[in-house]
């Protein structure tokens, strides 16, 4: 096979009509690297046309060599087809992505990504840990404090209270803290959404929301070079900083993990910022260990 040399990528544009070809590219990269280079919600945004893409077309628009994806103000996400690498394509795409978005994700922080970041004078500014543990979880004995009960989320009733507490709990978080009613509605419309796995700690009496644990089930992916079974996730675990009650996170975490085990899942995962020491300690107490590091890189001269 003769590999065409890297050229200049086309202009940034929305590409819902090219989503299938880009999905094939992303899947091939994930199979080769053992880690998905583009996150699920960004792939959804490519399909819907909400994201902007910069495509290295390679020899044919139907068989792209690489892509950079920009969504809102978030760090860009970039990948190159496994058989088109070491030709300067990644360098061109990452340079353009950082110029547009100011930063780029490196999922898995693989050695090739580290080397490219160093060559482009990019430095790590954020580390998002993926942690995992086996299920079921042994009973830990966490009980709701006096005056608190646990119930599940009720669509049509709890959205506004959840958004208020979520905004306070994640006020400094670059993604979760800006979730609004529209974004929540989009999440609730997804096939994976299940209110039976969305747990709320509320006052009793009063039913005032204090904390929440939203779980998620990822379906099995048996095909490809890196097949996986279904996975359960601590999707979002948040406590209202104004609640003033200790132990709510532990109670809700255990309840959610028990639910995921009852669904027949044998592995739970979560994502947590590496510098969120209290959360990391909680998850370590629950038996989670680091499975993967995801890093945001920015130019060395950028704050």
Swiss-Prot record:
Residues the record lists as binding acetyl-CoA 1: 78-80
Annotated SUPFAM superfamilies: Acyl-CoA N-acyltransferases (Nat)
Biological process per Gene Ontology, one example term: mycothiol biosynthetic process
Record function comment: Catalyzes the transfer of acetyl from acetyl-CoA to desacetylmycothiol (Cys-GlcN-Ins) to form mycothiol.
Residues the record lists as binding 1D-myo-inositol 2-(L-cysteinylamino)-2-deoxy-alpha-D-glucopyranoside: 175, 216, 233, 271
EC nos: 2.3.1.189
Subunit structure: Monomer.
Source organism of the structure: Nakamurella multipartita (strain ATCC 700099 / DSM 44233 / CIP 104796 / JCM 9543 / NBRC 105858 / Y-104) (Microsphaera multipartita)
EC top class, as a word: transferase
An annotated Gene Ontology molecular function: protein-N-terminal-alanine acetyltransferase activity
Highest taxon in the source lineage: Bacteria
Classification via HAMAP family: MshD
Family: Belongs to the acetyltransferase family. MshD subfamily.
Gene: mshD
Catalysed reaction, written as an equation: 1D-myo-inositol 2-(L-cysteinylamino)-2-deoxy-alpha-D-glucopyranoside + acetyl-CoA = mycothiol + CoA + H(+)
Keyword Ribosomal protein: no
Protein name, UniProt field: Mycothiol acetyltransferase
Residues holding acetyl-CoA 2: 237-239, 244-250, 276-281
Domain N-acetyltransferase, first and last residues per copy: 148-303
């Amino acid at each position: 096979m003769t590999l065409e040399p890297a050229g200049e990528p086309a202009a940034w544009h929305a590409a819902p009509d090219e989503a299938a070809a880009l999905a094939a590219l992303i899947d091939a990269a994930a199979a080769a690297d053992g880690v998905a280079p583009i996150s699920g919600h960004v792939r959804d945004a490519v399909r819907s046309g909400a994201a902007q893409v910069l495509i290295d077309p390679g020899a044919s628009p139907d068989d792209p060599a690489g892509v950079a994806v920009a969504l809102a103000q978030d760090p860009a996400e970039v990948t190159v087809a496994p058989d088109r690498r070491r030709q300067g394509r990644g360098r061109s795409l990452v340079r353009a992505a950082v110029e547009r978005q100011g930063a780029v994700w490196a999922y898995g922080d693989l050695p090739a990504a580290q080397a490219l970041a160093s060559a482009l004078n990019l430095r790590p500014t954020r580390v998002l840990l993926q942690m995992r543990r086996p299920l079921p979880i042994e009973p830990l004995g966490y009980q709701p404090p006096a005056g608190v009960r646990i119930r599940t989320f009720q669509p049509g009733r709890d959205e506004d209270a959840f958004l208020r507490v979520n905004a306070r709990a994640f006020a400094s978080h670059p993604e979760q803290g800006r979730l609004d009613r529209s974004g929540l509605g989009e999440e609730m419309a997804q096939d994976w959404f299940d209110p039976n796995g969305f747990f709320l700690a509320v006052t009793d009496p009063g039913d005032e929301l204090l904390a929440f644990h939203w779980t998620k089930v990822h379906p099995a992916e048996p095909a490809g070079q890196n097949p996986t079974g279904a996975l359960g996730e601590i999707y979002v675990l948040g406590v209202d900083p104004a609640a003033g009650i200790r132990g709510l996170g532990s109670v809700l975490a255990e309840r959610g993990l028990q639910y995921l085990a009852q669904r027949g899942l044998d592995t739970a995962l979560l994502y947590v910022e590496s510098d969120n020491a209290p959360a990391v300690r909680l998850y370590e107490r629950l038996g989670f260990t680091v499975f993967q590091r995801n890093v945001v890189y920015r130019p060395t001269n950028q704050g």
